[in-house]
A protein has these predicted regions:
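Catalytic His-Asp segment of secreted/periplasmic serine-dependent ester chemistry enzymes
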Residues: 7-109
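Conserved, well-ordered alpha-helix/loop/beta-strand core segments that scaffold catalytic motifs
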Residues: 2-5
Length: 109
């Protein structure tokens, strides 16, 4: 059985507020899941809550915010609000796994 998954949110803050992203894409995924009558895991909603709760500074730990010299692949540093670091990937994957369990698609551990 197919399962659809919305994208995680991006870390875009303006005036201290986390901004909505992926609106039309998320809506299209929800409509497709309804039309196909398949489960949808709303990773966007859950990741938005996680990032918002971490705050503007704290949420940097989830995304590719690297200081110069922190990672040899990015000697000058990096500021990427779309792609996750290991901590973010693990936290968002945990949330997705919880969604799969709540939807009855996989058994609880």
């Amino acid at each position: 059985m197919p399962v659809l998954l919305t994208p995680i949110c991006m870390r875009i803050w303006e005036n201290g507020m986390l901004q909505e992203t992926h609106g039309e894409y998320r809506d299209a995924m929800q409509a497709l899941a309804q039309r196909m009558e398949v489960p949808l895991i709303d990773a966007y909603r859950d990741s938005f809550r996680i990032v918002a709760a971490a705050g503007e500074e704290g949420s940097k730990a989830f995304f590719m915010h690297l200081a110069p010299g922190e990672d040899a692949r990015y000697p000058e540093g990096l500021r990427d609000n779309a792609h996750t670091r290991r901590a973010g990937a693990a936290r968002f994957a945990e949330s997705i796994a919880r969604g799969l369990i709540q939807a009855g698609l996989v058994p609880a551990p």
